[in-house]
Design a protein with these regions (language model features):
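Structural signature of cysteine-dependent C-C bond-forming condensing enzymes
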Residues: 1-9, 17-71, 81-83
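Short beta-strand scaffold segments in enzyme catalytic cores
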Residues: 75-79
């Protein structure tokens, strides 16, 4: 599973963050590209995740997920699928 964070490119968009992330997920699926997490230089060795550092990846994207963890414990997850 490829991991990416758009917040590295935009900063925190507060109330618009979830909507923006949803658009990025849909565009990622439409264009078959995984956006990078920019400025990711030193990965935590204890976090064994498949990050997408500094450069996008062109590959088929059929499912994407957006996690939104808000202030005061208001959290939401959206999963998008081409099917």
């Amino acid at each position: 599973v490829d991991i990416s964070s758009t917040k590295s490119m935009t900063g925190h968009l507060l109330g618009g963050a979830g909507a923006f992330e949803s658009m990025v997920c849909l565009l990622s699926m439409q264009n078959n590209v995984i956006p990078p997490t920019i400025n990711l230089v030193n990965k935590d060795e204890d976090c064994d995740l498949n990050y997408t550092p500094n450069k996008s990846i062109n590959k088929e994207v059929n499912i994407s997920m957006s996690n939104s963890f808000g202030f005061g414990g208001h959290n939401g997850v959206l999963v998008f699928s081409k099917e």
